[in-house]
Amino acid sequence: METLLKPFPSLLLSSPTPYRSIVQQNPSFLSPTTKKKSRKCLLRNKSSKLFCSFLDLAPTSKPESLDVNISWVDPNSNRAQFDVIIIGAGPAGLRLAEQVSKYGIKVCCVDPSPLSMWPNNYGVWVDEFENLGLEDCLDHKWPMTCVHINDNKTKYLGRPYGRVSRKKLKLKLLNSCVENRVKFYKAKVWKVEHEEFESSIVCDDGKKIRGSLVVDASGFASDFIEYDRPRNHGYQIAHGVLVEVDNHPFDLDKMVLMDWRDSHLGNEPYLRVNNAKEPTFLYAMPFDRDLVFLEETSLVSRPVLSYMEVKRRMVARLRHLGIKVKSVIEEEKCVIPMGGPLPRIPQNVMAIGGNSGIVHPSTGYMVARSMALAPVLAEAIVEGLGSTRMIRGSQLYHRVWNGLWPLDRRCVRECYSFGMETLLKLDLKGTRRLFDAFFDLDPKYWQGFLSSRLSVKELGLLSLCLFGHGSNMTRLDIVTKCPLPLVRLIGNLAIESL
């Protein structure tokens, strides 16, 4: 939802492999002269005609590299030794490198392209970045957000929203890393090897770099983090575009957080039926009368919703809104794993970012949370590596993993995962009813929930308030669809408390 920005617009810290779909208009094995097309086929063909609109426009933006004089590891040196090796130069990786290195810890950051611009758009609540001292990294702010529940009801939220300036944020983090003498190495990490008190990474060019601790910040697709439970994720999937348009219907002082309306599918019965079961919403950032970021998003599904389906719904929506796209500036394909189990705690490789479990299980938000938790993890690392006792090996791994995931934070995450499991059981009508009640709550509850600021007790109170504010149908949804996820929640909380 945040990039999609998105958790997982070419998502997040390290972009996962995008889902790509290929449409073949006239397969050679079908003969139109001998086969009569079914009604379903005709409906699909109608959608395909729409599908050929702005989706056929190539993005005009080109990959950009930043001009920063960073310090490189000597590729010819045979003795590259560091305290901490960070795999990945996404937002989470650079934030951690900045935070750890300011304590005098020797840090090396390894990435295939450390100076390349991040490809995603990131959205955050303005107060989140203000609290982190990063408000100067926002390039646009909206004083209000809105949520369209249906054609007859809209919620207006007095909480400012902002778009992160990828360039400003990356420059800020890189410059801090330069000041703190962080070293960079341009390569892809193929393997991580461990000894009792030391680990090594092996890069695709054969280079080996040694360190006391390896932290994986390479994103969701990483193979370096281990799990001891099945990874039953939910998935957020979205298609986002920054586009130049003739005009659009959005108020420039309001960011559209969610638009759950489905009137745009009135002439698309095939799409409308599917949307009623597994709904998608529009996320919109209007910058000017002719410039807007648009994203069609499946909040969470299991298995992941078809990417082709998401794009077709977006085409139908923009056509209904009368938005004519003149050019596509940027395009994002985003898939974010949400919820599921945490990595095995502890283990030899530390994690931060998409593969560490910090993605909000109910919303997909992660960037602001990564910025907030990197200093927490940095302190745990420094307590080990910066101590006079020189803690290494298993003691260090235990300290850093539990620094990121203490018991209370693990229990809170289980509660947010319960929220995700509830969303998975709701159709469009149920989802609308839930958000109608959710945004009627005291702002401290809905704001705290979306920003991962609530305790287990506060989340319990939120649930009671939600039940009280909900319609009779919402209460029925909760009573009939939540018992099994609730049993799982209680079981998981019991396991975490052992």
Curated annotation (Swiss-Prot):
Transit peptide: 1-42
GO terms (BP aspect): carotene biosynthetic process; ubiquinone biosynthetic process; xanthophyll biosynthetic process
Subcellular location: Plastid, Chloroplast
Entry's EC annotation: 5.3.99.9, 5.5.1.19
Chief place of localization: plastid
Signal is among the record's keywords: no
GO molecular function, one term: oxidoreductase activity
InterPro entries linked: FAD/NAD-bd_sf, Lycopene_cyclase_b/e
Domain of life: Eukaryota
Metabolic or biological pathway, per its Swiss-Prot or TrEMBL entry: Carotenoid biosynthesis; neoxanthin biosynthesis; Carotenoid biosynthesis; beta-carotene biosynthesis
Recorded GO CC terms: chloroplast; mitochondrion
Tissues expressing this chain: Expressed exclusively in chromoplast-containing tissues of flowers and fruits. Expressed in preanthesis flowers.
Chemical reaction(s) catalysed: all-trans-violaxanthin = all-trans-neoxanthin; a carotenoid psi-end group = a carotenoid beta-end derivative
Record keyword Chloroplast present: yes
Keywords: Chloroplast, Isomerase, Plastid, Transit peptide
Similarity comment text for this entry: Belongs to the lycopene cyclase family.
Record-linked PANTHER family: CAPSANTHIN_CAPSORUBIN SYNTHASE, CHROMOPLAST PROTEIN (PTHR39757:SF9), PTHR39757
Function: Involved in the synthesis of neoxanthin, the last product of carotenoid synthesis and a precursor of abscisic acid. Involved in the beta-carotene biosynthesis.
Protein name according to UniProt: Neoxanthin synthase, chloroplastic
